[in-house]
Amino acid sequence: MISASRMEESASSSSLSDAAAPPPGAALQSIRSSCDRCRFHKLKCNVPAAGHGGPVPCERCTRAKVPCVFGRRRRANRPSEDKKRPAAPTRRATMPSPSPTPASTSAAHGGGDSATTGSADPPPPPPSTMDAALQRTPASHSDTGPAATYDGRSWETLMTGGLGDSPDILPGQHNSAGNGWEWFHQGFGLDDTSMFDADTLDPAIIWSPPTPQHIPTAALALATTELDMTTAPPATSGGTANMMRSSNTNTNSNSNSSSCWAPVQQLLPLIADMQQRLKMLEQGPWQGGDFPQSLDDYPVGAVLHLSREFGSIAGQVLSRAIAAGMVTGGGVPPVVRNHATDGGREFIVTNNPQKHLGSESSSSSSSSISNSSSNNEAGGDDGGVDTATALLVLGGYMWLMRIYGAALGHFQVHLSGLSGASESDGCGRGASRSGPNASPALRLGELPSTGTAPDLGRIHTALGMLQGALAEVEGQLGRGGAVARNLVVALLTRQEAVSRGVGGGGGGGGGGGGGGGGGVGGGGGGGGGPGGSSEHSGGSSDVDDCEGLGGKVQSVKELLREKMGF
């Protein structure tokens, strides 16, 4: 019994092995090319090699004694060869294409009969247009190829991975994160604000001082000092273009415009220093009841330095005005004529509005006169001085007079506090008059003095140096600043006449010469402002300041004579 059962098991196992193993000379088909029964059991058919002449059942169907039917096969769900190619990376064109397998060849050409499935492998299909399109460069790509030439992976390579390999990124342009997005803003100017705000630019390149044509009034000139020269230009592309055009205009401007702007650049900080020095003198220990017994620390050199600097700059401005015929050396403004024609009529505008010639002009003639006068006022073509610069010169002179008045007042109070007269053997006589050449750090106690009263000798020496420095300033601006004052009056009168129009009526009188004051500070009288009204803040205040300064000089001299025994 046991031997019989073992024999049956061995026989069954041998039969199964014979069924599993293909017989010799049989062609092993794929599951898809097998018959319906074998495909249902997911087995491969074994078709005898001798049965190519007609429909021959497979070995399994023959042993099972069932009909072997090769039914119609369902179409495969796999995409075709043309659709599988775009799924490969973009660089697939450089890789060799894989050779077709026998299974795929038989699957593509297999028919409903076993003779077709058992035939030899057909030749590979000819290369499609996709291979040619992939092997071409982007420049030679044509529209005749398939629409799905580039897949989504190429976009990811371009937008993320390709940024680090972009030739537009220069070394050192990657940030700490290494994402490489900086080239997107640096290469394309999509945002002008990021370009300007992120870079530290030279203020002299992105912003240049305006030309005199752009400064019609003194207020605008003073307002330019409050601008932050380190700020960026406007954030719009139009503003940037305007800045570049303005820079080119300033570069190509004539020498007259640049020289007219240079004194303004020097006058603005100099006037600021004058204001600070006056504040220090008025709030120092020499003011009020706590007046010390000695003036050894008095900053005489700083006052002399301000006088020297202001006289040099103001001399350049007024020399230019005199050369242009805007004012004479004695402070008398000449007649300035601007001609404009309207048909057959001619109008003449002078610096005196009461002497207008001609009848009322039309709007076109008024516009022509206004443009002509504006050009002359700005000092563009005629090489003159604009109103803003003239006002700065006159304002600087007034600040200097206030500084001198404070210094002389301190000397006067100090001399008045000294008790009794002291003998002196000529101390201070022949003192140095080289005031403008003194050091800015010079103190009153450092001045030379001889005799038994050194304080009186030093004050006498300082007074002589201050007189010499002020005499040089008035040599440039006229006595009492008459040249600068009359230049301002002439410019303002002409501007007022042009704004009212030719023949439009009255104006202000020109600045006349004033009476002199005693000593150094005697000044000229002021004139009325535009419109015929007298401005106390103009010439009249100048006369008061100058006369007051002259009175202080005389008072200090009398006190020195009294204390020194002369």
UniProtKB/Swiss-Prot annotation:
PROSITE patterns linked to this entry: ZN2_CY6_FUNGAL_1 (PS00463), ZN2_CY6_FUNGAL_2 (PS50048)
DNA bind region: 35-68
Listed Gly residues bias regions: 501-532
Source superkingdom: Eukaryota
Compartments where located: Nucleus
Composition bias type Low complexity, residue spans: 1-30, 89-108, 359-378
Keywords recorded for this protein, A-Z: DNA-binding, Metal-binding, Nucleus, Transcription, Transcription regulation, Zinc
Region named Disordered: 1-31, 72-174, 346-382, 422-453, 500-551
Molecular function GO labels: DNA binding; DNA-binding transcription factor activity, RNA polymerase II-specific; zinc ion binding
Main location, first listed in the record: nucleus
Gene3D superfamilies: Zn(2)-C6 fungal-type DNA-binding domain
Gene Ontology cellular component annotations, sorted alphabetically: nucleus
Stated role: Transcription factor that regulates the expression of the gene cluster that mediates the biosynthesis of the tetramic acids Sch210971 and Sch210972, potential anti-HIV fungal natural product that contain a decalin core.
Protein name: Transcription factor tasR
Lineage: Eukaryota, Fungi, Dikarya, Ascomycota, Pezizomycotina
